[in-house]
Amino acid sequence: MKKLTLLETELAIKYIKDLFQNALSKELNLLRVSAPLIIAPDSGLNDNLNGWEAPVSFKSKTNGVSSQVVQSLAKWKRYSIARYEIPLYQGLYTDMNAIRMDETLDATHSMYVDQWDWELRISENDRNVEFLKNTVNKIYKVLKEAQLKVNEKYGIFEQKDLLPEHIHFVTTQELLDQYPDKNPSEREQLVCEKYKAVFVMQVGKKLSNNQVHDGRSPDYDDWSLNGDIMVYNPRSKKALELSSMGIRVNKEVLLKQLEESKQNERLELMFHKKLVNGELHQTIGGGIGQSRLCYFLLQKDHIGEVQASHWSDEIVVEAKAKGIKLL
């Protein structure tokens, strides 16, 4: 396997990002738009993630304005689809930069999050598993083509194909049924080892053991029509999540999921009021990790090799001992 220098790595990062976003926008019919780094705390537009991660917040001493740094743009994108009057079956994407200060740091997790956040306007009739799978297949096609072109240019992998021809679909309940004695991350590891590329469906939905596979905010994804694109990373020998996506909630599903998660107070926020009042279009959307994709396609040992972030002293010392050059 070829080892890239620091400069070669930076050039490869740009190549991958240009290649992937151009292909993705063409495949899904997306227009690039500008995105905010900070938003109003009372707008309801920020991503609450699993519910316990606090966003970075501050109040300006000069103008008194309170702001939150975004954690993702899941709800902002749907709001923007309506604002920009995006036509049916067209959408938008953006370079999303976020800070998640409560993230547990490791080889694939950073406090700095960079991803392509995308959203596509669809119809109410498209709220079904078939449409979801079709969209996943389109994204996987872009991913697989990018992998082949990156390897052709840089010779990263010994084999031509790092990814299988098709992605495997499985629900979180099916994973529980197959591996009842394993925890969710162990189930993901086993299914990724077997199929190499997997779309794990219905994340956030309560399973037969009365637990959820993983937490998901109740006000953007429909928990029965969402999922994560995961791959097996031969470098780390671990499952790697590259994307989280889903068909978004309609009014009925929003009310149901807020009730189930005991978060009905969100109905007082601007975004949620607009959704309940029918002012927002039906959409499908998601986020694709830019650094994660580069980390995977370039077969790096640490995401800090493809992303300039801030790390704990322990991680810096460990990386240096292993010869890992953090950006």
Swiss-Prot record:
Keyword Iron-sulfur in record: no
Compartment annotation: Cytoplasm
Swiss-Prot/TrEMBL GO biological process terms: L-asparagine biosynthetic process
Pfam families attached to this UniProt entry: AsnA
InterPro entries: aa-tRNA-synth_II, aa-tRNA-synth_II/BPL/LPL, AsnA
Known pathway: Amino-acid biosynthesis; L-asparagine biosynthesis; L-asparagine from L-aspartate (ammonia route): step 1/1
Keywords of this entry: Amino-acid biosynthesis, Asparagine biosynthesis, ATP-binding, Cytoplasm, Ligase, Nucleotide-binding
EC number of this enzyme: 6.3.1.1
Main location: cytoplasm
GO molecular function list: aspartate-ammonia ligase activity; ATP binding
Root EC class: ligase
One Gene Ontology cellular component: cytosol
Top-rank lineage group of the source organism: Bacteria
The reaction(s) this protein catalyses: L-aspartate + NH4(+) + ATP = L-asparagine + AMP + diphosphate + H(+)
Family: Belongs to the class-II aminoacyl-tRNA synthetase family. AsnA subfamily.
Protein's name according to its UniProt entry: Aspartate--ammonia ligase
Species for this entry: Mycoplasmoides gallisepticum (strain R(low / passage 15 / clone 2))
UniProt lineage: Bacteria, Bacillati, Mycoplasmatota, Mycoplasmoidales, Mycoplasmoidaceae
Name of encoding gene: asnA
